[in-house]
Structures are given as structure tokens and as C-alpha cells.
């Protein structure tokens, strides 16, 4: 099988997806803007050939690269990046070269929050009320219906960049004076007071969930980004039944097959009800794939590659641990030094590292990943690391 991996060098964990595709027999080809000499040895081993482009945003260059590989190796069976930023480019290439997977006729349903809502409604899962902005008067009518506060965010994209909580009409006008918002399509959502619970995993060619997981975010990512705060989250050993039921209903509504998925729900504080927020048909970002590996003693990189290549039946796994992530920000003064953290809880820490600058606003400048057998213990470690 000819698989073309776009941007295999970034983010860093793309190497692992590539490695196991190669291990399971794929003829793996890569396109990226990094010099071949800068690729790590594990990635070089995984790639049969690498085509460097000077600008990954230049579609003509990508078109020529895919054409080159098609002429040399025959039909490309898969084109993947597993990266939210490149999903539209993936769909365009699949459309132009008739490659299996999500194409132009469906991609906006996975990218635009305004289009996701109809699928959430089809699933029967309650969703956040939203309005796609057209003009001030109509927006204020929507706000009158749902009440302040509301959340303004880009219609397309992930993360919390250019996302704002608005508490009154004065703030509304201030936010909409932002040139970026004037030039972009965005939506206004009702504010839901709750924590985020995710439904993550793998769904096979037949629509069967073969691996499932859940992360718990007790902070507002919007507040973390806007206030330049430090983030923490917890990968749970078990998926709550209400999250599982909602997640599988959403997967069925979107008719998801042979993909990673990462679906975000609110658990509303006032009544514990699950409310759908958004869907991402890709692995969860940052260190979350590794968190799933640690929580379940498994290897999701390997299991994804195995699923794509249908190499052998999937290996089942059971969650055992709470895996925590606690970030630090350079501008904050913490009570405990890095050395004190390693001395005190080093036996629980699985990995620690600085974060790439492009992710640091949300994910922190430096972070620790660790696991324990109880929720109480993982929270104590988070508090210790982030104590100021």
C-alpha cells in the first residue's frame, strides 16, 4: 500500500505514526518543508522516499510532489497528516487524485463548527446553541435569546485562539472591533458552565469503535490562552457511560470510519448533562496520544497503523492509570524548582520537556506527564507542580 504522509517531521509524534506504518508493510512516502538531513533517524528509517517543498502552503508544489510519487510508485492509497491544520489540504489532494478518505464534499462538516451542529442534532445529543455571525443586529437578537455571557470563536479551526467570553454589549463591540474578527468567519455560542470531557479513540472500516478513551479538562482552555495561564488535564482510565453513549451517537451521525476521533463535550455543572461542543476527526493534540498509551498500557500509534493496513486483529486494552499533564509558564514564579519536583515525585513522572513555541500559549512553556492509580493522587501532583 502506498501511503503519503504530509508533514511527517512536525509535530514530533508524527514519527511514531510513520514508524508503525512502515513496520506493518506500507510503502511510506513523505512530503515536508524540512531538509532531509534534519529528520530524525527513526523517521528516515520509516520513509521510502521524501520530497521536500519550500512552502507547504503552496498547493502547486504539493500537487507536483504527489504527481511525482504517483508517476513513480503508482496510485496513492492514503494521504494523511493527522493534523487539524492540514485537513482541508488533505481533502483537496484526495479529491484531485481520487484517494480514499474525506474529500472536498464533506470536509467543511468536520472543520466548521456551524456545520457540525446539524450532525449533533442528528445524533440526538444536546449541543451548544450557536449563531454564525452576519451582522450586529442579528447577533444581538441571538444573545437576547440565550443571554450573556456568550463565547465568540472562529467558525473553522481548533484550540482557543481568537476565542472570547463576552459578558455585555460593551465587550461585544470591543471584540468586534478586532480586525482579525472582521476578516474572518466566526460564530457566537451560548456559554456553558462546565468541564470538558473528551471521547477519543479509533473507529475501524466498519464503524466499530476498537479503542476508546476520555480526557478531563477542569479549566477553560479559552481562559488559559487569554490569561496566559498554565494548563493541566487528566487522561482517565475509564470512559463514563454517558460520554460513551454520546460519543458513539455522534460517530454514527457523522458515519466515521477508519479514523482517529477526538470529540469534545461539556459536562454541565448545574445538572451533569452532556452537551456536544465540537468534533475532530484526528488524534487529540499535544501529548495526549502518549497519555492514552500510559493510561491503558497500549500503543495507539501502532494500533492506528494496524487498523489502516488491516495487518492483524486489534489488540484490546484496559485502562489502569490516571495520566496527568501539568504545564508551567516562564512568566510565573513557582514554589518548587524542577530539581525539587524530580526529587519529590520523580518516580511518578513519565516524561518532561519544553514545549514547541507554536503550542506554548495553550500548552505551557514546560510540562510534566505522570501517572498514578487514583484521581486524588494525580491532582496532588498537579497542585505540587503548579503551586506558586
Predicted stretch roles:
Residues 170, 190-256, 260, 280-308, ...:
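ATP-dependent carboxylate/phosphate-activation module, predominantly the ATP-grasp catalytic core
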Residues 126-128, 149-152, 161-198, 224-229, ...:
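Conserved ATP-binding module of the ATP-grasp superfamily
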Residues 4, 303-388:
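Peripheral (often C-terminal) accessory segments that flank ATP-dependent C-N-forming ligase machineries
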Residues 1-105, 373-376, 380-386:
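ATP-binding N-terminal substructure of ATP-dependent carboxylate-amine bond-forming enzymes
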Residues 257-269:
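A short glycine-rich, hydrophobically flanked beta-strand micro-motif that places a catalytic Asp/Glu
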Amino acid at each position: 500500500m502506498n501511503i503519503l504522509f504530509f508533514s511527517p517531521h512536525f509535530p514530533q509524534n508524527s514519527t511514531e505514526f510513520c514508524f508503525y506504518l512502515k513496520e506493518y508493510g506500507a510503502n511510506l512516502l513523505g512530503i515536508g518543508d524540512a531538509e532531509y538531513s534534519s529528520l530524525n533517524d527513526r523517521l528516515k528509517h520509516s520513509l521510502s522516499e521524501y520530497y521536500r517543498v519550500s512552502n507547504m502552503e503552496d498547493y502547486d508544489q504539493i500537487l507536483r510532489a504527489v504527481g511525482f510519487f504517483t508517476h513513480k510508485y503508482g496510485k496513492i492509497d492514503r494521504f494523511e497528516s493527522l493534523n487539524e491544520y492540514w485537513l482541508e489540504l488533505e481533502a483537496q489532494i484526495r479529491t484531485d487524485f481520487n484517494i480514499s478518505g474525506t474529500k472536498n464534499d464533506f470536509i467543511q462538516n468536520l472543520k466548521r463548527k456551524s456545520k457540525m451542529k446539524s450532525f449533533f442534532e442528528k445524533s440526538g445529543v444536546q449541543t451548544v446553541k450557536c449563531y454564525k455571525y452576519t451582522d450586529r443586529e442579528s447577533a444581538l437578537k441571538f444573545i437576547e435569546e440565550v443571554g450573556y455571557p456568550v463565547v465568540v470563536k472562529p467558525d473553522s479551526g481548533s484550540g482557543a485562539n481568537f476565542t472570547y467570553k463576552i459578558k455585555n454589549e460593551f465587550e461585544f463591540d470591543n471584540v468586534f472591533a478586532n480586525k482579525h474578527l472582521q476578516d474572518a468567519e466566526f460564530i457566537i455560542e451560548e456559554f456553558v458552565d462546565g468541564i470538558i470531557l473528551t471521547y477519543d479513540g479509533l473507529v475501524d472500516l466498519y464503524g466499530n469503535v476498537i479503542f476508546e478513551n476520555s480526557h478531563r479538562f477542569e479549566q477553560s482552555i479559552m481562559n488559559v490562552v487569554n490569561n496566559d495561564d498554565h494548563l493541566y488535564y487528566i487522561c482517565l482510565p475509564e470512559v463514563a457511560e454517558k460520554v460513551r453513549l454520546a460519543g458513539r451517537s455522534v460517530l454514527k451521525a457523522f458515519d466515521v470510519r477508519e479514523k482517529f476521533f477526538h470529540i469534545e463535550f461539556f459536562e454541565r455543572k448545574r445538572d451533569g448533562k452532556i452537551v456536544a461542543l465540537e468534533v475532530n476527526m484526528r488524534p487529540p493534540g499535544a501529548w495526549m496520544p502518549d497519555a492514552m498509551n500510559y493510561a491503558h498500557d497500549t500503543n495507539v500509534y501502532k494500533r492506528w497503523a494496524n487498523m489502516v493496513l488491516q495487518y492483524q486483529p486489534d489488540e484490546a486494552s484496559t485502562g489502569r492509570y490516571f495520566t496527568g499533564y501539568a504545564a508551567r509558564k516562564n512568566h510565573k514564579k513557582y514554589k518548587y524548582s524542577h530539581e525539587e519536583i524530580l526529587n519529590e515525585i520523580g518516580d511518578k513522572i513519565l516524561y518532561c520537556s519544553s514545549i514547541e513555541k507554536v503550542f506554548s500559549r495553550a500548552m505551557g512553556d514546560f510540562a510534566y506527564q505522570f501517572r498514578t492509580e487514583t484521581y486524588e493522587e494525580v491532582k496532588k501532583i498537579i497542585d505540587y507542580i503548579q503551586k506558586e
